[in-house]
């Protein structure tokens, strides 16, 4: 798994509004967009990241989600092909 590549891609998406817009398009292919941006990630990387992210939520993050409010910006990447959501609160 290329966790470093995925983390680097997420960081780039957070800083690049053009990438954010590309990923918001319905049916956007996250892996293809990442590849076009110079990152080598796979669907398996996205699945593993999602599984790990769900396991590692803090109590504050869980409370924020349950309450419907989060005091930060959430950058999310949705893979329409595999129906995954990769997100990070900043």
Curated annotation (Swiss-Prot):
Post-translational modification, as annotated: Cross-links are proved in vitro, when coepressed in E.coli with the ProcM lanthionine synthetase. The lanthionine residue has a DL configuration (with 2S,6R stereochemistry), whereas the beta-methyllanthionine residues have a DL configuration (with 2S,3S,6R stereochemistry).
Cross-link Lanthionine (Ser-Cys): where in chain: 76-79
Highest taxon, organism lineage: Bacteria
InterPro entries assigned: CHP03798_Ocin, Nif11
First-listed, main subcellular location of the protein, grouped into a coarse class: secreted
Protein induction: Down-regulated under nitrogen starvation.
UniProt keyword annotations, A-Z: Secreted, Thioether bond
2,3-didehydrobutyrine: modified positions: 69, 73
Pfam families: Nif11 (PF07862)
Record's subcellular location: Secreted
Pro-peptide positions on chain: 1-68
Cross-link (Beta-methyllanthionine (Thr-Cys)): 78-82, 81-90
CC terms in the record's Gene Ontology section: extracellular region
Cited NCBIfam families: leader_Nif11
Function of the protein: Lanthionine-containing peptide (lantipeptide) with unknown function. Does not show antibiotic activity against Lactococcus lactis 117 and Bacillus subtilis 6633 bacteria. Organisms that produce this peptide live in oligotrophic environments at very dilute concentrations, suggesting this peptide is not secreted to influence other bacteria.
Protein name: Lantipeptide prochlorosin 1.7
Organism: Prochlorococcus marinus (strain MIT 9313)
The organism's taxonomic lineage, starting at the top: Bacteria, Bacillati, Cyanobacteriota, Cyanophyceae, Synechococcales
Gene coding for it: ProcA1.7
